[in-house]
């Protein structure tokens, strides 16, 4: 299936692309800049609105739901395979899909370790692999890391089934905390699917948008 064909399966009209050198602005770069702005008080101009991050995640989940609906699994969702472009930071998903995964994991094991689901490392392949990865990406979007070591430690703890959520997240945003915990649980049969996640995130986006308008 060609990437363009997936556009018609996705109500939010987000295309799915295979990663290429033409896609220069990776989400991983964006997050590094955002974290610098948060902790170093630099002059880097990146959006800091909570609703913005939820909106971008809704875009991502919408794209994943589209590929899952045609029995395609990404198997390697991570910030280096998510691209942002334009003044509105339009989001695109790249990377290796489906049966290509076995070759990719062999050649790039360190790149996917923190984002790959525990069962995925054991060669259990299911759409729920992507849901774990989405949980990690969501956490990174909404919780800036001060250092690379802090990031690695936190995501490794998730991999080791230690779900210690920051108080600022669990107390300030309990619904988001609940969603992240559901996505990164180790029993993949209990993880929600992309359709459920999209509905939950769209509802959250509506709530945050409504609250912002009242302020």
Curated annotation (Swiss-Prot):
GO CC, sorted alphabetically, is: host cell cytoplasm
Q: Which reaction does it catalyse?
A: L-seryl-[protein] + ATP = O-phospho-L-seryl-[protein] + ADP + H(+); L-threonyl-[protein] + ATP = O-phospho-L-threonyl-[protein] + ADP + H(+)
This entry's Enzyme Commission designation comes to 2.7.11.1
Organism of origin? Autographa californica nuclear polyhedrosis virus (AcMNPV)
Presence of the UniProt keyword ATP-binding in the record: yes
Keyword annotations from UniProtKB, A to Z: ATP-binding, Host cytoplasm, Host-virus interaction, Kinase, Nucleotide-binding, Serine/threonine-protein kinase, Transferase
Q: What is the lineage of its organism?
A: Viruses, Viruses incertae sedis, Naldaviricetes, Lefavirales, Baculoviridae
Instruction: Give the protein's function.
Output: Plays a role in the inhibition of host eIF2alpha/EIF2S1 phosphorylation, thereby increasing viral fitness. In the insect host, targets the endogenous insect heme-regulated inhibitor (HRI)-like eIF2alpha kinase.
Which protein family is named in the record? Belongs to the protein kinase superfamily. Ser/Thr protein kinase family.
Q: Which GO terms describe its molecular function?
A: ATP binding; protein serine kinase activity; protein serine/threonine kinase activity
Its main subcellular localisation, reduced to a broad class, is host cell
Name of the molecule in the record:
Probable serine/threonine-protein kinase 2
Q: Could you list the residue ranges that cross the membrane?
A: none
Q: How does it assemble?
A: Interacts with the kinase domain of host EIF2AK2.
């Amino acid at each position: 299936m060609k990437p363009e064909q997936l556009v018609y399966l996705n109500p939010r009209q987000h295309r799915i692309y295979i990663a290429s050198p033409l896609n220069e602005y990776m989400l991983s770069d964006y997050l590094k800049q955002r974290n610098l702005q948060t902790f170093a008080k630099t002059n880097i101009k990146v959006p800091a609105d909570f609703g913005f991050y939820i909106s971008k995640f809704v875009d991502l989940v919408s794209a994943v739901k589209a590929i899952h609906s045609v029995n395609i699994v990404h198997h390697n969702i991570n910030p280096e395979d998510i691209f942002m472009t334009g003044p509105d930071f339009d989001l695109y998903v790249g990377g290796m899909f489906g049966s290509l995964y076995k070759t990719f994991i062999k050649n790039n094991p360190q790149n996917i370790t923190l984002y790959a689901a525990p069962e995925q490392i054991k060669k259990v392949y299911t759409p729920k692999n992507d849901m774990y990865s989405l949980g990690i990406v969501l956490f990174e979007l909404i919780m800036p890391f001060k250092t690379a070591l802090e990031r690695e430690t936190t995501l490794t703890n998730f991999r080791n089934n230690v779900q210690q959520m920051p108080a600022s997240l669990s107390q300030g945003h309990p619904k988001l905390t609940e969603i992240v915990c559901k996505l990164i649980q180790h029993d993949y049969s209990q993880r929600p699917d992309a359709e459920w996640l999209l509905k939950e995130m769209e509802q959250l986006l509506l709530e945050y948008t409504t609250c912002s308008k009242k302020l």
